[in-house]
Amino acid sequence: MSQEGDYGRWTISSSDESEEEKPKPDKPSTSSLLCARQGAANEPRYTCSEAQKAAHKRKISPVKFSNTDSVLPPKRQKSGSQEDLGWCLSSSDDELQPEMPQKQAEKVVIKKEKDISAPNDGTAQRTENHGAPACHRLKEEEDEYETSGEGQDIWDMLDKGNPFQFYLTRVSGVKPKYNSGALHIKDILSPLFGTLVSSAQFNYCFDVDWLVKQYPPEFRKKPILLVHGDKREAKAHLHAQAKPYENISLCQAKLDIAFGTHHTKMMLLLYEEGLRVVIHTSNLIHADWHQKTQGIWLSPLYPRIADGTHKSGESPTHFKADLISYLMAYNAPSLKEWIDVIHKHDLSETNVYLIGSTPGRFQGSQKDNWGHFRLKKLLKDHASSMPNAESWPVVGQFSSVGSLGADESKWLCSEFKESMLTLGKESKTPGKSSVPLYLIYPSVENVRTSLEGYPAGGSLPYSIQTAEKQNWLHSYFHKWSAETSGRSNAMPHIKTYMRPSPDFSKIAWFLVTSANLSKAAWGALEKNGTQLMIRSYELGVLFLPSAFGLDSFKVKQKFFAGSQEPMATFPVPYDLPPELYGSKDRPWIWNIPYVKAPDTHGNMWVPS
């Protein structure tokens, strides 16, 4: 497959067919990632997506920018290129080859480039010392940056002054003021949050050695349950990672529908003092907590219900029962223990609604329990109708895109948008086409000028095979920009959805979730609209003004602004209104090369 665009020419062989066209948020691989040096067996090993593999490969052996075409072999070019998409497909590959079977496990060397502060103009080339061994630099980087916030007063962050308890992760390489109210995983697991008794970590990707080191030394031997979706070789690799740790047990989430993933990211933290729930967007690997924009919701510290009392411990948002229902969907004995723990705690102070997805085919009232129908039900029951609602846009922001069909009517602007448009019991759904839809997904230029450079695109696994089938979608795309939080150059792995006012000064609701823009994550109707089919596990929290005694939230002008703004202003982590792609912008596609311009480390992107 020969292609050409603003960022260079390339060829993709049929063996590079990506599983991204399958409807799932991240593409699992059975690859194990190892650091190739003495003692490699002791380095982190974890399964990840094909896109993440490519990013790791280019961190090991970056391809330095060159003004010549000598890097790539001569290519055939088809006449009548898709100029509007920026890609040109050779005629011999117009029909995609059948999907290749999942590759067998292979070992890939990892190297992390030494962190360098953000570029002044976004185009400056980076230079670095390549003399040190790759894994030595990785260790230096982790030691230097994986410490909790210096001088950060955790108590100030957890006090009642922040009604939303919505945070971003710390980003290495931004000004300190943009990390002053952000959290690292070490902060979350800190003794300041509670005296840990045991914990459960729900996630997609695990680096077990790294994870254990994020716990304080005094908590590292406390029981840890890892809830994952790995199968076959990937499962074997995860078990091998966990084997040295007697306190770690594993729970495999059942994934009975093809191409589903366990994408949920949640921590259950049981303390001597109570229980805390953390719902977030980061994989449990170093890169996800380093230079990306990620979201975190922290629950209050839930006290234990005194024995002999008949208090339910339920919140006005029904969070306790909904969390238990979500955990019961796993049908796993090891989670029954955590369900019992939750039953014994008072969750009544919770002010968010839980929105989950679990694999299955749901009919009747069960259809409203999960996915976009769950969002629709909550918006119907608890959101306030707005005058001129048809002029209130819908915003979706995500880090991957599934296959959404031949045109917008197949899913995006039919069932999905209809759920997003719901506002109150009496509100009529406005004409679906009349409500503006803003989709935020990083452009190639966003990735090129990011702190990580092109390897940031390893966590944005939108493939050419999927993208070329839905050119119509990209007219909705808007750039990533986050001056409000100092994260314009920290590529987003966070996923958010919201309903802002026409002038973007207010929002009717805000959702932070693990769910990307895919049918696998949100569900798709079957059987003439009577059945909702979901492939994956996802989890997020919905902020509704009614739970805070409000009709709408005002948007906070600066994400990290202090007490000068009213308490009830909501901290949206990126800039509003979103900026539409320019005529030369293209969505980031992970599995094609970009060789015409260097990234912030002076490198090109040649993924294979």
UniProtKB/Swiss-Prot annotation:
Disease: Spinocerebellar ataxia, autosomal recessive, with axonal neuropathy 1: A form of spinocerebellar ataxia, a clinically and genetically heterogeneous group of cerebellar disorders. Patients show progressive incoordination of gait and often poor coordination of hands, speech and eye movements, due to degeneration of the cerebellum with variable involvement of the brainstem and spinal cord.
Molecular function via GO: 3'-tyrosyl-DNA phosphodiesterase activity; double-stranded DNA binding; exonuclease activity; single-stranded DNA binding
Protein name: Tyrosyl-DNA phosphodiesterase 1
Location in or out of the cell: Nucleus; Cytoplasm
Enzyme class: hydrolase
Known outcome of mutating residue 495 to A: Abolishes hydrolysis of the covalent intermediate between the active site nucleophile and DNA
Coiled coil segments of this chain: none
Any single Gene Ontology cellular-component annotation: intracellular membrane-bounded organelle
Main subcellular location: nucleus
Keywords: Cytoplasm, Disease variant, DNA damage, DNA repair, Exonuclease, Hydrolase, Neurodegeneration, Nuclease, Nucleus, Phosphoprotein, Repeat
Binding-site residues for substrate, renumbered to this chain: 265, 495
Sites annotated Interaction with DNA: 518
Pfam families noted in UniProt: Tyr-DNA_phospho
Tissue: Ubiquitously expressed. Similar expression throughout the central nervous system (whole brain, amygdala, caudate nucleus, cerebellum, cerebral cortex, frontal lobe, hippocampus, medulla oblongata, occipital lobe, putamen, substantia nigra, temporal lobe, thalamus, nucleus accumbens and spinal cord) and increased expression in testis and thymus.
Keyword Ligase: no
Protein's organism: Homo sapiens
Residues forming the catalytic site: 263 (nucleophile), 493 (proton donor/acceptor)
Start and end residues of each stretch annotated as Disordered: 1-101
Modified positions (Phosphoserine) in chain numbering: 61, 148
EC number: 3.1.4.-
GO biological process: DNA repair; double-strand break repair; single strand break repair
Result after altering residue 493 to N: 15000-fold reduction in activity
Subunit structure: Monomer.
Region feature (Interaction with DNA): 400-403
Domain of life: Eukaryota
PTM summary: Phosphorylated on serine and/or threonine residues, but not on tyrosine residues.
CDD domains assigned to the protein according to its UniProt record, in alphabetical order: PLDc_mTdp1_1, PLDc_mTdp1_2
